[in-house]
Amino acid sequence: MHAIAGLTGLLAGVSLSYAAPTHENITSDAYFYGQSPAVYPSPEGTGSGAWASAYEKAKAFVANLTPEEKVNLTAGTDADNGCSGNIPAIPRLNFPGLCVSDAGNGLRSTDHVNAWSSGIHTGASWNKDLAQKRGLHMGSEYHKKGVNVLLGPVVGPLGRIAEGGRNWEGFSVDPYHSGLLVYETIRGIQAAGVGTSTKHYIANEQETNRNPESTDGIDVAAVSSNIDDKTMHELYLWPFQDVVRAGSVSIMCSYQRINNSYGCQNSKTLNGLLKTELGFQGYVMTDWGAQHGGIASSNAGLDMVMPSSTLWNSNLTDAIANGTMEASRLDDMATRIIASWYQMNQDAGFPSPGVGMPADVYAPHQAIIGKSSDSRKVLLQSAIEGHVLVKNKNNTLPLKSPEMISVFGYDAKGPDSLGFALEWLSYSPAIQPNHTLIVGGGSGGNSPAYISAPLDALQQQVIEDGSSILWNISAQDPEVDPNTDACLVFINSYATEGYDRAGLVDEGSDELVTNVASKCSNTIVTIHNAGIRLVNNWIDHENVTAVIFAHLPGQDSGRALVELLYGRSNPSGKLPYTVAKSADDYGALLHPKLPEGQYGLFPQDDFSEGVYIDYRAFDKQGIEPQFEFGFGLSYTTFDYSGLNIGQVSDNSTSRYPPSAAIQEGGNPHLWDVILRVSVDITNSGPVAGDEVAQLYVGIPNGPVRQLRGFEKVNIPVGQTVTVEFALGRRDLSTWDVVAQEWLLQSGTYQVYVGRSSRDLPLQGEFTI
């Protein structure tokens, strides 16, 4: 067991002050040495708490391994299957090996599985219970297919850069929001007996220059995320703390550098923060091709390399022989990997690794059915709840028995063909022009069993109603029948791994919207968006009556949307990011950082804004957003009243018990309840609905407000429910870089409760 006392020197904060260069261009990484503190040795897993039995078995298993067998556990190998990566079997000890596969929104490159809603869509649902159910049902598909480890979910990137190409894979730009949803997701997936490799650790906030590049013989290193200790803890490490507390068996380290040390050999973040401070018991796996050093990476805390390693292999045993690596480090690497296998109970009753992942899906192979009829309800509900209604002029929606609807836009139709993975565009256009967008591009993509496109679902609805539907998918300036009751315009905003987005708008799509709106007095716009999408060019058009951010719903996209359009479901989604009125409002956090000036060969991205990203930055700078973080409309109305703030006895500003043994997630006293808050919410509208009650706290000397509670509740018409929030010590503390502790602050705290980060009808305070 690790104790908190004595960690101050080990976990000292990172300085962002650099010595002035003595030459125009920096040509050696030696210039940056020491900017990321060295933390050695790599802590051994303790097998504490829920891991005790798994570690006992793993240590006995590893004791019977040869050095070569231990080494083989630490790096991927080729196998005749379609898994993203494989660890070889050890037949003499009945270890069948491991299959690890993408990704956090459903399996890809295989058949008989579902394409689930993406991370951003789950974030927009604000539904913790649904997040766990989604994880459980999705995890069961991986289990049936013989996948030991799901490569996900994602909490890095957090979403610092508005144009970030992979923001859609994560849940939210807020660390608290993201942390609770990833916690429930991991609990769900691992309850299905499948491990998670949560990613990308850490501060992986842009795709541009994420990897080293070489052009015309000139080598450019990966971008460095330069981040101070306070910001690291209060933003980027926060959701990973919830990841560790949830018991994730693996964490995937990221491509880029952190304070000029590569993420997969950064001893500060791996040995210091993850394995010591947070008490992580699982193993650290590289992203694909993210290993940049040999023995240095193992000593820094890396445990497994994917998809293979040319730097380890026999070099590990050689390093032990020559004293550059301890034998105990290799034992710990192997133990962490095998303990995770035992922790998921995969030693008994688990399918053969990769049995449902054929190397060639188009060649004859055994059909392993991953999807289940039991998942249908959760699949659809997950798709429904991530839609966010942001405009509904004169209660345009839900539709009132229209006799005729007209459909326009490239995003309305399904793809012309459907294989075992949607097209991964080899560049990053503003839109996916060929079909409706249900998922982003890259390794986070998935393999739909079918795609319910909006046009298909609307046609089915029209058949059932006996009404009429017209459509023109391809025209940029279509004709509109004057007798149509509603014009439904479908556009999208694309994003993919490997590229950051070129912008937050698309002129062609905006022109389509305004062209239709100029001819139709009831224009309803649906945007399938893989990230922030600005709407300032047409949001105030008098004929644009309703707007839905539909995000990335997965294969039930059309079905989910029609449920909402026709009022069988009431919109309950809320934005997990801020939509600005102008791209310039995001300031320096709009674009990714590029190589420039003296850092042309070593790109530097200074996180100098600290904790002020997204709504925190808008609040600090007094910028009025188009739609604030947490905003979303309903077909009903909710009234808030009866704010009650009750402190519990232990609210000392002193350090929490320093002798407390570290458990998964850190000091267990961080979750001691310090404050209880309750409010009453009444449904004062015409229909039943779900409301997301949000609690924000203004901590002394901190941001104006930070999300510190949310609950989604169903409220019948005319009924009142009481919503309760329990706030822990971590929720009300700030990170002290000197004490290296989470500390409560002396002074007056503000408490806000309401419908969004800016619609907060209830306000109170308490003093510590």
Swiss-Prot record:
One of its GO terms (cellular component) is extracellular region. It comes from the Eukaryota. Belongs to the glycosyl hydrolase 3 family. One of its GO terms (biological process) is cellulose catabolic process. Keywords: Carbohydrate metabolism, Cellulose degradation, Glycoprotein, Glycosidase, Hydrolase, Polysaccharide degradation, Secreted, Signal. The active site is at residue 287. Pathway: Glycan metabolism; cellulose degradation. Glycans are attached at residues 25, 72, 259, 315, 322, 394, 434, 472, 543, 651. This is Probable beta-glucosidase M. It catalyses: Hydrolysis of terminal, non-reducing beta-D-glucosyl residues with release of beta-D-glucose. Residues 1-19 form the signal peptide. It comes from Aspergillus oryzae (strain ATCC 42149 / RIB 40) (Yellow koji mold). It is found in: Secreted.
